[in-house]
Amino acid sequence: MQPHPRLAAAGRRTSGLGLAAAGALHLLWATGSPWPARSRDALADAVAGSPAGLPPAPLTAAVGAGLLVASAGTATTVAPRVQNVVRGVVGTGLLARAALGGRRTTVLLGMPAPSATFVRLDARAYRPLVAVLGAAVLAGIEPVPTCRALRA
């Protein structure tokens, strides 16, 4: 079942903006800014689950760049068939992250158990936001005419 064209357009806009904002934030963190936290230690505790430190700047920048590429891939309609595959992969990945939660995700990534601050923020903000973004990405999947429909 395909979403209504307006729903698909809203999903593309929402997911494009959300992923672009997350990408820009990661690029900002890669420069050394702790915003919106007061310090890099507080930021590390809130977003990485460990006051011991943040991932290296190049890795954070790579995540930011990847989010910006995902934003472009989910928000545009240049090659619908390819972009629907991209949307399916990105949307499913985001929903899987939301379903697993930050605690399980950090374990799967081989990281130490996350702090109580991270677990609380994950439950209240990160998981719901990631779930909404995942649903928006999937809502952006648009109908692509089949060969039969083109012949008719």
Question: Residue ranges of each PLM-predicted region?
Answer:
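Short amphipathic, positively biased membrane-proximal segments
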Residues: 1-152
